[in-house]
Curated annotation (Swiss-Prot):
Organism: Psychromonas ingrahamii (strain DSM 17664 / CCUG 51855 / 37)
CC annotations in GO: cytosolic large ribosomal subunit
Phylogenetic placement of the source organism: Bacteria, Pseudomonadati, Pseudomonadota, Gammaproteobacteria, Alteromonadales
GO terms assigned for molecular function: rRNA binding; structural constituent of ribosome; tRNA binding
Biological role: Binds directly to 23S rRNA. The L1 stalk is quite mobile in the ribosome, and is involved in E site tRNA release. Protein L1 is also a translational repressor protein, it controls the translation of the L11 operon by binding to its mRNA.
Protein name (Swiss-Prot/TrEMBL): Large ribosomal subunit protein uL1
Matches recorded under HAMAP family: Ribosomal_uL1_B
Alphabetized InterPro entries for the sequence: Ribosom_uL1_bac-type, Ribosomal_uL1, Ribosomal_uL1-like, Ribosomal_uL1/biogenesis, Ribosomal_uL1_3-a/b-sand, Ribosomal_uL1_CS
Amino acid sequence: MAKLSKRMKLVRDSVDASKEYEINEAVVLLQKLATAKFTESIDVSVNLGVDPRRSDQNVRGATVLPHGTGRTVRVAVFTQGANAEAAKAAGADIVGMDDLAAQVKAGELNFDVVIASPDAMRVVGQLGQILGPRGLMPNPKVGTVTPDVATAVKNAKAGQIRYRNDKNGIIHSTIGKVTFTPVQIRENLEALLAALIKGKPSGAKGQFLKRISLSTTMGAGLKVDTSSVKATVA
């Protein structure tokens, strides 16, 4: 039998796999178990009461977390004219049109979010095979194709997350770092849940938020007692 590492022993001795943890208790325990040599993220998985095989029950959107994600986000914007100046003033890291497209085609993808004004989609549309597989393709459904590029840049910099359920109807997202306080993590989680409830498909029947679990980048998952989190009645 393989010898358990100190980390795995700590997890084994600390986590009750059958328990649903109160949100603050869950965060404190995750922080205790976060022993990696880097600052781990805290991630959430939310099982939704949807049928992901039906296109009208897929959930997709974006929301700004009140305390951000703890990440420094680099933003690229495809736009021109006055919008280009507005994007730069809002904090965009890279702004351009054909010149920016050339950088992307050359493999220079040193950004985390791509935003485009509608008039720039003629250029961005040529980059679908590069941006799409990386989850970077601008989309109006999540606010990354918009005439108001300045607000989109500010949202991205402020900690906006984009989410989409997977083939099993589960939403996965990062909601902070282990250095955040339990209150910050709870409020970020509540903001995400409120956005999910707001976007609940009309065809979804029964309980919408079925199960919530938290984990760290390198750690075990903990089930969360949904009654300890606001905005979970759905």
